[in-house]
A protein has these predicted regions:
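Residues lining hydrophobic/aromatic ligand-binding pockets adjacent to catalytic sites
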Residues: 1-248
């Protein structure tokens, strides 16, 4: 069954109200608001997609300095929001009955969430409310191997990963990547190391019978379809090698 990975609206996940060019104008009063999360995202997504809902991702946009200095408050807000989401899924609204395999995931755009004093608390919040961490392969974040320790804190659990922007382009490199890679018909910046790490996580997750949901952007390597094909081929090759080595 084809499953969709759906990202929550900025109304809920961006701490700032932004102008047309993306510049922050003022604080967003709806940031991580529990009611908005359920009413504007979780419920309509599940009611619209049903069993095709794979993962609902709350991608927290880059935080301004005053929020980065108040990370415990951010985590408390996140906890309250995820609690409301879980209540909507499993409580009186019973939304999960329409999408029994849906995964709730949180993605971030600040390495501060991976700090030694913050990461354990983030993992605790996610575990408490039945959510997982979405691996964010993006130039704003550390490479995949630096994010895996957080995923290990949640193990065993489903995998959600979004490959967005090759690290070579820097934190604001979307337009540069688009200009370089169009018409997105070939891989121009292969990232075999990331692919190898991701392959291992996919196989370990699937071996536990858990969902492994991965999306890849054209700006990750140059061509999303070819990146997906290369990842699938590596997964298949590792499986074939393991089958060859196993006793008959």
């Amino acid at each position: 069954t084809f499953r969709f990975v759906v990202k929550a609206p900025a109304l809920v996940t961006d701490s700032l109200v932004r102008g047309e060019q993306g510049q922050g104008k003022q604080d967003n009063p709806g940031f991580l608001d529990p009611r908005l999360a359920v009413d504007t995202f979780v419920r309509p997504a599940i009611e619209g997609l049903g069993t095709k809902a794979g993962a609902l991702v709350f991608q927290i946009s880059p935080l301004p300095s005053h929020w980065l200095r108040a990370m415990p408050v951010v985590l408390e807000r996140l906890s309250l929001m995820l609690e409301a989401v879980r209540d909507a899924l499993d409580g009186e609204q019973a939304l999960r009955s329409q999408a029994p395999d849906v995964v709730i995931a949180v993605e971030v755009r600040d390495a501060a969430f991976l700090r030694a004093d913050i990461q354990p608390r983030l993992a605790e919040v996610l575990l408490q409310h039945g959510a997982t961490y979405c691996l964010g392969l993006h130039a704003k974040m550390p490479p995949i191997e630096a994010q895996l320790p957080l995923l290990r804190r949640l193990w065993p659990g489903p995998l959600v990963c979004r490959g967005n922007l090759h690290r070579k382009h820097g934190t604001y490199g979307y337009q540069a990547a688009k200009d370089l890679y169009e018409p997105f018909d070939r891989i121009q910046d292969a990232d075999p190391e990331t692919r190898s790490h991701l392959t291992r996580v996919i196989l370990a997750t699937a071996a536990r019978g858990l969902p492994a949901l991965v999306t890849i952007n054209n700006k990750a390597e140059g061509s999303a379809p070819l990146s997906v094909e290369a990842l699938a081929q590596e997964v298949a090759a590792v499986l074939q090698a393991a089958d060859t080595l196993s006793p008959r």
